[in-house]
Amino acid sequence: MLIVLKAGIDPSYAPVGSAHAALAGYLEWEDDDLTYEWAQRVFHKHIKMATPEQFEKAKSEKYGDKIVITESSLGGEEIAIVYRVKEEYAGFLNSLPKWKVKVCSCPTKLG
């Protein structure tokens, strides 16, 4: 499964957007043979990052079936795209950089 996140959103929404995208894609295409095989065997999710311009290009019909994920707490802003599971994705989508988790310095104790 391939998920594209839009760069420039609040970083705290990236994990939520990815999770929502993966679930939305699975529920939409769960009866598809490749999706079923992916869920039963592989279950890898490739999460890519796209500039706003690349994100718009990634929404193009030529890249196949997709769902655009919006975030209500950001006023309905589009934050992610999930694509139907395929054997291989178009070169443009593969060329996008992987999303990298940014480590923060969090308090060691809550309270």
What are these regions (language model features)?
Residues 1-111:
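Positively charged, small/polar-rich N-terminal and surface patches that mediate targeting and assembly
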